[in-house]
Amino acid sequence: MSVRYPLLNRELGILGFNERVLAQAADPQVPLLERLRFICITSSNLDEFFEVRMAGLQEQIRDNPGALTPDGMSLQHAYDLVVERAQRLVHRQYTMLHETVLPALEQEGIYFHASDSWNDEQLEWARRYFLDELLPVLTPIGLDPAHPFPRVLNKSLNFVVELEGRDAFGRQAVMGIVQAPRALPRVVRMPHALSGFEHGFVLLSSFMQRFVGELFPQLVVKSCNQFRITRNSELFVDEDEITNLRVALQGELPARHLGNAVRLEVSADTPLHIVRRLLEESELGDKDCYRVAGSVNLVRLMQIPDLVDRPDLKFTPFTASTPAVIANAPTMFDAIDAGDILLHHPYESFQPVLELLQQAARDPSVVAIKQTIYRTGTDSPLMDALMEAARNGKEVTVVVELLARFDEETNINWASQLEAVGAHVVYGVVGHKCHAKMMLIVRRVVQAGKASLRRYVHLGTGNYHPRTARLYTDFGLMTADQKICEDVHHVFQQLTGIGGELTLHELWQSPFTLHPRIIESIRAEIDNAQAGKRARIVAKMNALLEPSVIAALYEASQAGVKVDLIVRGVCALKPGVPGLSENITVRSIVGRFLEHHRIYYFHAGGAEDVYLSSADWMDRNLFRRVEVAFPIRERKLKRRVIAEGLSVCLGDNQSAWQMHSDGHYRRRRTGKTIRNAQLGLLAKFCS
C-alpha cells in the first residue's frame, strides 16, 4: 500500500498510550493505592493489546508476509519494533512496582509476604490454608506420553514444576503442570496478628511455590515457576453463513480460551530449558517470551485498593451533581419538556438517565421504548427497567450488540432475559456493529384536550453502563426536539427492519453520512481559510486513524486552518511537520477518569458547529459500525460543551501530554498557574 501522507504506526501508538497510563503510577501527585491501580490498568490494557492487535499482526505475517502496514513498514519490521517497545514497557512496569510502589506501600503498613520470609507461625498458617482451601481444588498434571502438555486456558495462572524421582507406578517424573482455577483467590489476607502489618497479604503464587510438593508426594521438587499464556481472542463468526448470530456466538465463545498463543509470560528465575519447553509447546518464538520479576498477572492486584481501607491513599470520593432543572421537576418528562438537558459524566450523575427509563417503564402514558445496548455490565438497573417496561405491557425494542468485544457472553444473557419477558430483541445489522448510544421513548400526551404521541430521546457518547459512568468522561443529551427524535426513529427503523437508506436531517450516521459530513466540514474550514476568514477545527476522541480524514486535516493545516486535536489514545497523524501539519497540535489527557467523549467543533464562519458522537475517527467507526453524531444547537449547552469538553483540555498543564512530530509524547507541565481539566470540573460540579 502506498502512503500519500505520512502516518504513524497504530500498534506503537497504543503502546505509547499505555506508557502514559503507566506514568500515572510514577506520579507522586497520584495517591499511592491509585498508583498501584494504574500499574494494574496497564497490565489489563496490555492483555487486550496482545489478544487483539498483536494476534492480528502475527496472523498477517503468517498469511501475507510481504504486505506493508498502513504507515508503510514491512509487517516483520513493525512487529520487531512493537515487541522491543512492549518489552521495555513491561520491564519499566515491574521495576516501578518493586522499586517504588511496593516499598512505599510497606511504609504505609501494606505488605506482601513472600514465602521465603515467613516465620514459623506464618508458615504454619500458610500450610493449613494451602491444605484446607487450595489443595482440594488443584489438579496436578504429570507430563509423560500418556499425559501430553495441556492446552492451558487464555490468561490463566499456571505453574510448571520440575520434578525428580519415580511415582507410584514406577514412572520417571520430570515435569508437572498445575493450573490455578479462576475461582481461587490470587491474593489472600494474612491475619493481622500474624502479619505484623496493618494489611498483610500473600499471593497465591507464594503458597504454590512453598507447598506444591504436596501435589506430587514422594517426589523431589527442583523448581516451581509460574507462567501465563495469552491467546488470540478474536471470535471467528462467518457473518455471511450464519442463520442465528446468537447461536453462532454461543458456539464460538468457548474457543476464545484456546486460540493460538501470542505471548508467554514467565517468572524471571525460570530455568532456560523450561522456558524453551514452554515456548515449543506454545509454538512461540523467543521474542514472544516476557520474563517478569514477580507475578505474571498484575491485573489481580487491582483488588488491593478495595481490600485496604485507607481513604488517604486513594482519590478523594465525590458525589456527582444533578442539574437543578431535573431536581426541581416532577418527572423527567417535565424536565425535558422545559428544554434540552446536557449531562456531563462523571461530574454530573448518570442517575437521571436511569430515572428516565425507570419512569418510562412505570408511566401508563408511555407506549414504546427503543434502546441500543453495547456494554452495560452484568448487574444493570437499566436492563431491569427495560424488562419491567416489557412486563408492564410497553412495546420494548432493544438492539443488543452481541459482538461487543469481551462482553459477548454478558450481552447474550441479557438478550435471553429480555426475550423471556416479551421484549423485541434484535442484533443490529450483520457486518456492522451497533455502537450508537440511543434511547427513544414514545409517550401519549394531552395538550389543549387533544391527545398525541410525543417522542423523548437520550443520545450519548458513552455506554449505558452505570459503573463506567463514574469512571469515564462522557456527554449525554436529553431532548424532545422533533427533528432529532424523528432522526433517531429512522435509525431504529433501519436497525430493526429492512429497507433503503432514510434521510436524516440532524444526525450524521455511519456508515452513510458521518464520514462525508466530517470531510465536508473540514473542507468548509479550508475554504474559509483560503478566503481569508477565520477557520478553526477542534476535535476530541479516543483514536484518530482513518487515512482520508487525516489527509483532509493535513490539507487544512496547509491552508492555514488552526487544528487542535485531543486524542486520548492512538493517533496516526503527525503534527507539527513544516509544510504539512505545522498548524496542527495533538495532545492526550490521562488522569483519574478515562477521557471518553467524542466532540467535533468546526468554526463554520462563526456559527460554531458542535457535534457529539460515539464515533472515533477510525475506519471501523466510519465504515463498519452504526454510529451517530448529534448536534448541540442550544447556545448555552454549546458553550458548555466547548468550555467543559474542549477548552479545559487545551488549557490543561498537569494531565496533558503534547505529541511531537516523531510520535512521542512529553508531559505538558508549564506555566505558573496549575490547570487540571478533571480536577477543575470536579471542583465545579461535585461535592
UniProtKB/Swiss-Prot annotation:
EC numbers: 2.7.4.1
Catalytic center residues: 435 (phosphohistidine intermediate)
Positions that bind Mg(2+): 375, 405
Residues reported in the UniProt entry to bind ATP: 45, 472, 568, 596
Any GO BP annotation: polyphosphate biosynthetic process
Post-translational modification, as annotated: An intermediate of this reaction is the autophosphorylated ppk in which a phosphate is covalently linked to a histidine residue through a N-P bond.
Keywords: ATP-binding, Kinase, Magnesium, Metal-binding, Nucleotide-binding, Phosphoprotein, Transferase
Catalytic activity: [phosphate](n) + ATP = [phosphate](n+1) + ADP
Enzyme class: transferase
GO molecular function: ATP binding; metal ion binding; polyphosphate kinase activity
GO cellular component assignments: polyphosphate kinase complex
Cofactor: Mg(2+)
Tagged with keyword Cell membrane: no
Domain of life according to the entry: Bacteria
Keyword ATP-binding part of the UniProt annotation: yes
HAMAP family listed in its UniProt record: Polyphosphate_kinase
Entry function: Catalyzes the reversible transfer of the terminal phosphate of ATP to form a long-chain polyphosphate (polyP).
Stated family: Belongs to the polyphosphate kinase 1 (PPK1) family.
NCBIfam families per the UniProt record, alphabetical: poly_P_kin, PRK05443.1-1, PRK05443.1-2, PRK05443.2-2
Protein name: Polyphosphate kinase
